[in-house]
Curated annotation (Swiss-Prot):
Taxonomic lineage from the root: Bacteria, Pseudomonadati, Thermodesulfobacteriota, Desulfuromonadia, Desulfuromonadales
NCBIfam families: rplN_bact
Cross-referenced Gene3D superfamilies: Ribosomal protein L14 (2.40.150.20)
Originating gene: rplN
This protein's name: Large ribosomal subunit protein uL14
Keyword rRNA-binding: yes
GO molecular function: large ribosomal subunit rRNA binding; structural constituent of ribosome
Top-rank taxon, per record: Bacteria
Length: 122
């Protein structure tokens, strides 16, 4: 569950290291975002000579959340940290690699490029 002002780790090699959520997309009254949702973020930490700079406003797809997400079979998935992948306007990742596992829920929301780049899908 991600809301405004939530700090997220970045799970790709776009150059950003920390993001701060500034808007949850999907309606003016929407308060929370979950796995596979797109949010608008501000880059709080970035590597030098990277594609995204500190202070840039970017879109990101949430790939891991600390809040458990129930699944249809009765199980639930949760991760240690909140993480996101920086994407462009078309929803394609800016980076060329993804670090760490991603949730299976991304496949249902048609983020096939992110799922295929991930080393593990849980």
């Amino acid at each position: 569950m991600i809301q405004m002002q939530t700090m997220l780790d970045v799970a790709d090699n776009s150059g950003a290291r920390k993001l701060c959520c500034i808007k949850v997309l999907g309606g003016s009254k929407r308060k929370y975002a979950g796995l596979g949702d797109i949010i608008i973020c501000s880059v709080k930490e970035a590597l030098p000579n990277s594609r995204v700079k500190k202070g840039d406003v970017v879109r990101a797809v949430i790939v891991r959340t600390a809040k458990e997400v129930p699944r249809p079979d009765g199980s639930a998935i949760r991760f240690d940290k909140n993480s996101a992948v920086v994407v462009n306007q078309a929803g394609e990742p800016i980076g060329t690699r993804i670090f760490g596992p991603v949730a299976r829920e991304l496949r249902a929301q048609r983020y096939m490029k992110i799922v295929s780049l991930a080393p593990e899908v849980l």
